[in-house]
Amino acid sequence: MSKVSNGGGDSKNTLYCSFCGKSQHEVRKLIAGPTVFICDECVELCMDIIREENKSSMVKSREGVPTPQEIMAVLDDYVIGQKDAKRVLSVAVHNHYKRLAHQSKNSDIELAKSNILLVGPTGCGKTYLAQTLARIIDVPFIMADATTLTEAGYVGEDVENIILKLLQAADYNVERAQRGIVYIDEVDKISRKSDNPSITRDVSGEGVQQALLKIMEGTVASVPPQGGRKHPQQEFLQVDTTNILFICGGAFASLDRIISARGEKTSIGFGATVKSVDERRIGEVFKELEPEDLLKFGLIPEFVGRLPVIATLEDLDVDALVQILTEPKNALVKQYQRLFDMENVELVFHDDALRAIANKVVEHKTGARGLRSIMEKILLDTMFELPTLEGVREVVISGDVVDGSARPLYIYAERQDEKGNVSA
């Protein structure tokens, strides 16, 4: 309990800290609570104790950092194929959070952060991989579109708004946000517009790369709580981006030609066999990616340097797309079967139907994200009619249905009339 003195002095009533006993004249600040007081020195001491407790609990939670094999196993449940990319990501994410867990240990060696670049054609699973990783580690996750970003002061979205979104995803818990994952999509669209510096400022290309450098490497970002542009009268939240893991992704159209051109220069001579770009799959070409190819594509050296871990993804063939339709825990076929099950109807896909769907996606070059739109188109009429039809117990989709030359087959349950006769 705080003490109050009625003795002499400058003041008739002297207040004392309830914890250390110092008077209000011996400390800078005395904070009042219901019948108690606490001085600024005790507040600082409490903060130090809490910080040390947080650090020690992070070190003790070593088991909380999944191993690369554990991360890979979960990725395998949701993402089909892309074995090499999943191995690279599993190791990189494990090392990143292991580094954070051991930060409080005294060491002369400072472990640098390794941000990740995902390179692969449209619809091969780049975004989905990043989302799944965030779920495994249980950290705040946000996606940003690089094409909407501009330098501060120009029309468009500020780079620091990315940090604001991450803070919102963490329910404004700054400590949690500082351990989150940011996925920046379409970074290939912010490449330098030309090799020659121009008088006109490139605010959505090289300018955005420059703006991203600081937050990717580590800086204390001043974030306006309500978003939007900064105002002098506004109070800012301070977020340290040093421990935020940045994963950048892009399709990098035409990068395969840059890689192949470099390969052709080193494959000249008797007996050298050089396949043209058209003879090789894009994913196969991407495996030969070197940082110099990204520089030629239009990324600036400093930006490439902030992305030391590069994972390349392959374009999906028909077999992989059929697997994506049926095998993952949340496979599209399983999702639609669940929807039909709500109507007490079984949805059946023939093998030739699944391959026909996959072939359409390969033909349109939309990747895995094109599967849902094709499924919706095939099942639209059935989903429209089904709630008003009585007695349907099964709907069968064949290859002809996918091609548009037939309608889905409806199989009705057998019904008995009053005399016991069975009718279809």
UniProtKB/Swiss-Prot annotation:
MF (Gene Ontology): ATP binding; ATP hydrolysis activity; ATP-dependent protein folding chaperone; protein dimerization activity; unfolded protein binding; zinc ion binding
Keywords: ATP-binding, Chaperone, Metal-binding, Nucleotide-binding, Zinc
Top-level taxon: Bacteria
SMART domains given in the database record: AAA, ClpB_D2-small, zf-C4_ClpX
Gene Ontology CC: HslUV protease complex
CDD domains membership: RecA-like_ClpX
Chain positions recorded as ATP binding sites: P121, T122, G123, C124, G125, K126, T127, Y128
Ligand binding (Zn(2+)): C17, C20, C39, C42
ClpX-type ZB domain boundaries: 5-58
Any one GO BP annotation for this protein: cell division
Keyword Transferase appears in the UniProt entry: no
Family note: Belongs to the ClpX chaperone family.
Function of the protein: ATP-dependent specificity component of the Clp protease. It directs the protease to specific substrates. Can perform chaperone functions in the absence of ClpP.
Subunit structure of this chain's protein: Component of the ClpX-ClpP complex. Forms a hexameric ring that, in the presence of ATP, binds to fourteen ClpP subunits assembled into a disk-like structure with a central cavity, resembling the structure of eukaryotic proteasomes.
Protein's UniProt name: ATP-dependent Clp protease ATP-binding subunit ClpX
Gene source species: Brucella canis (strain ATCC 23365 / NCTC 10854 / RM-666)
